[in-house]
Amino acid sequence: MRQRFGMLFQNGALLTDLTVFENVAFPLREHTKLSNRLIRHVVLTKLHAVGLRGAADMTPAQLSGGMARRVALARAMVMDPEILIYDEPFVGLDPISLGVIVRLVRRLNDALGITSIVVSHDVEEIATVADTSFLLSNGKVAASGSPDELRTANSE
């Protein structure tokens, strides 16, 4: 069941003693019996998908915040999950990295056809990546709908 889910943690949760390649390969090594050759192919494909194929030999300490978030995203999707959960994916990013991550999340959703659950306080950015949003207030759903529906309801 766990292998059907991918998780992008707010802080990335990269293992500091491992290279970028090894961080992304970690779930494959733990949960599959794939050969090293196939693991290499899958990891480099996922790094390419997030625009970081050339960073495979770097360590987390050598990465910018935006790069680290993309490596964590590659790791979250390395098992080809059906559902990808993002915990505050936009927090702490500079405007350029924020734009990259927003476009990447939208592109991956569209290309992979997976279900993504994005937990965020950034309502503006959610509107650019979500098909449907749920706004919570005091632990209850205060509103739901497409970004356009929520904008219309908010302006009335």
Model region roles, listed by residue range:
Residues R37-G54:
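Conserved ABC ATPase "signature" region
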Residues T59-L63, M67:
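Conserved ABC ATPase signature
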Residues D80:
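Conserved catalytic motifs of ABC-family nucleotide-binding domains
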Residues L84-D87:
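Catalytic Walker B motif of ABC-type/P-loop ATPase nucleotide-binding domains
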Residues S120-H121:
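H-loop/switch region of ABC-family ATPase nucleotide-binding domains
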Residues I126-T128:
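A short, surface-exposed alpha-helical micro-motif characterized by mixed small hydrophobic
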Residues K140-E156:
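Conserved beta-strand-loop-alpha-helix hinge in the C-terminal portion
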